[in-house]
Amino acid sequence: MASGRDPREERPGGLEIWDLSREPWDEWLRDMVEEINNEAKLHFGRELLYQVWNYCQEEGERQGRPIAERAYKYYRLVQKALFVHFRCGCRRRQPFEPYEERRNGQGGGRPGRVPPGLD
């Protein structure tokens, strides 16, 4: 410590670590939500993903949060669900079929809001 400097390295800022300045946050988030939806619809089915999306949107509206923050919450929830699903041992060999979503011939209607990548 002869030079008077702290020998520990300084912590880099968030943008230095992730370098998000090169791509707008909204565009990055939209791409990530579409990618995770492409994987999630093979394992969970669209109806469940619609319900999670609508939950995030309605909860965010109640709390006055921006749309990007609501989409990020959806992304985190689906990512955690996929992690647990794979951790428990996914045995699915085929993509999720629409008829599997309907129990005893009863299926829900399509909700008003659809997450990106599930159109």
Curated annotation (Swiss-Prot):
Source domain of life: Viruses
UniProt keyword annotations, A-Z: Host nucleus, Host-virus interaction, Inhibition of host innate immune response by virus, Viral immunoevasion, Virion
GO cellular component: host cell nucleus; virion component
Chief localisation class: virion
Keyword Lyase in annotation: no
Transmembrane segments: none
UniProt miscellaneous comment: The 155 isolate is from a monkey imported from Kenya.
Function field: Plays a role in nuclear translocation of the viral pre-integration complex (PIC), thus is required for the virus to infect non-dividing cells. Targets specific host proteins for degradation by the 26S proteasome. Acts by associating with the cellular CUL4A-DDB1 E3 ligase complex through direct interaction with host VPRPB/DCAF-1. This change in the E3 ligase substrate specificity results in the degradation of host SAMHD1. In turn, SAMHD1 depletion allows viral replication in host myeloid cells by preventing SAMHD1-mediated hydrolysis of intracellular dNTPs necessary for reverse transcription.
Protein name: Protein Vpx
